[in-house]
Swiss-Prot record:
Functional note: Beta-D-xylosidase showing an optimal efficiency with the natural substrate xylobiose.
Taxonomy of the source species: Eukaryota, Viridiplantae, Streptophyta, Embryophyta, Tracheophyta
Thermal dependence: Optimum temperature is 60 degrees Celsius.
Protein name: Beta-D-xylosidase 4
Organism: Arabidopsis thaliana
GO biological process, any: xylan catabolic process
Signal peptide (UniProt feature, chain positions): 1-38
Amino acid sequence: MGSSSPLTRRNRAPPSSVSSVYLIFLCFFLYFLNFSNAQSSPVFACDVAANPSLAAYGFCNTVLKIEYRVADLVARLTLQEKIGFLVSKANGVTRLGIPTYEWWSEALHGVSYIGPGTHFSSQVPGATSFPQVILTAASFNVSLFQAIGKVVSTEARAMYNVGLAGLTYWSPNVNIFRDPRWGRGQETPGEDPLLASKYASGYVKGLQETDGGDSNRLKVAACCKHYTAYDVDNWKGVERYSFNAVVTQQDMDDTYQPPFKSCVVDGNVASVMCSYNQVNGKPTCADPDLLSGVIRGEWKLNGYIVSDCDSVDVLYKNQHYTKTPAEAAAISILAGLDLNCGSFLGQHTEEAVKSGLVNEAAIDKAISNNFLTLMRLGFFDGNPKNQIYGGLGPTDVCTSANQELAADAARQGIVLLKNTGCLPLSPKSIKTLAVIGPNANVTKTMIGNYEGTPCKYTTPLQGLAGTVSTTYLPGCSNVACAVADVAGATKLAATADVSVLVIGADQSIEAESRDRVDLHLPGQQQELVIQVAKAAKGPVLLVIMSGGGFDITFAKNDPKIAGILWVGYPGEAGGIAIADIIFGRYNPSGKLPMTWYPQSYVEKVPMTIMNMRPDKASGYPGRTYRFYTGETVYAFGDGLSYTKFSHTLVKAPSLVSLGLEENHVCRSSECQSLDAIGPHCENAVSGGGSAFEVHIKVRNGGDREGIHTVFLFTTPPAIHGSPRKHLVGFEKIRLGKREEAVVRFKVEICKDLSVVDEIGKRKIGLGKHLLHVGDLKHSLSIRI
């Protein structure tokens, strides 16, 4: 310090002078200490108990409506202070009793250590790590989606109460898994817009909804990302930072937007994150139509819009969309961006204001959305231990119930793709089980990306060894092995009653910023599988751990390979779930949430083409089960059980008449479709109403209890480039052996049977619609 030098130079003074100087120094030190303590950053915002003077501030008055509290707070801030609340590491305002706040935390499938807002310690060393989202989606169980969200938010609140976590979580990822090579497909609920929408709203509700049911309060704040048409990370040199997704309005409204709409409209999500990429030449984080127009205008978001990390910087530096940083800051804020993950807005917004590019009122609007969210979370209500979730703590993390839910989620999601009758295995008939493969004894691989520290791990090897005697050999040093230990693996398999090969991928193969270039098994794994199958004494089971699918046609057609399981990235309890299914303690019920294509598909389809619909002229085959008609390795919805289910139609109309107004144009002309909105939709069934019911009797014809997902698909008339089929609904049912029950679907005619036309408008096709459940088909005619 500058004042210390003169004092230290006085060491030559007589003793009496030294004493006087010492007393002066001591008084100065005590004064400075008291002043520093008085000015130190508060721990909790509006902690009136610790600082009674804060009670005078309107924004600290919990009796007032949140909107009034927000307005009061914004009015008290300087421009520089306001700008400090535009960035993810928000500055505190000591004079108002507001601490700093880190917005960035993640909770994709459990509380994560990704993002600076959350960390683990000896107090809370780990949190429940659920399966990666793609496997949870394979359960097709909406109540499970919500239950997982509820556990994750409880553990997050418990960690927040002891200073280890934030309240704002930038999860879930609800992008459509459009291309099988995408490295982040593992984070998503799959390729179907309805499934993705159901997952989005279900998980968000689990995270956000409070026990008291107050819709204006949040348990934690979720964030649906990455808005929008984002599904290229790094493919053959094409990076997300510069990629321009060229998307038709039809595909935008039919495929890419529905999960985000469901997040906001059905899930009441508190936040949406805009993505790095451009859409049709505009950066998503600077597009007023996408942000202010759709998210906040049409969908009525009650919360904040945040950029992906450094997205505003990216649109300036990588995309060269603006000439200056100040322009980038201004157009993003004016487009509707409220918060910048990163520091860009903190560095350049003041210059944008001084240059007249953006006014202070726009900044007020942005930070008001941020404060609104924090107030709904109780951040401005003082010590969290005195609030609704104040009793939560470390003992509420990694509870036995939470860990069992993680295991059950993996069981429900695992998909049985092939079974020649070998499965389930009988432990009594197995003396030796060979466990081979690079993923057989992995830990971190099981939890995928955006992970946290799990409560504990149970590897596939540990799960299997808990039931029967096992011998183990990796066979490959890693999933991308250049050399496989074929000799050792075949020797092991040649003496075992059954051989289990646990293979697949990990984050070195598919991840954020890492897209695949082909659909082959990595490294020498295919050769390892082929040779083990040839040499094995007994049946061979293939367990595939991955986010995306592989072309495993060779294994599908190999008679020595008796069973194939896809287990996604099954989470901390993956080994338990795998063993439970292999040994028949759990009857598999998972269904693929994405198509598994042959290698030939990706050889002719660039990842950068965003079109969903096929183009006969160019030979482009289209994407996902809704439009692709070519050969598949395994199809969307595939998944076997240890029992057999059959379906019988009980109830469904054969004809629906849409009554039109007298002056409707289609009364005097040949119309192929009608707008999917209007009086004709509200009175579409006899007796009035907009919906009808489909009843399906489901019978379990086997001798084993089972859980079955019933899919209701529809094939609409061939108009407006309609899908070859699309999912109308799905229901899960548990049936005992030889038991039957009726599953009921409510079909909203103009919502569920409509298609999106070329300009993005929903239309209900006139003519023949085909409803189908499994092999069961029913024709429905819609006319005027």
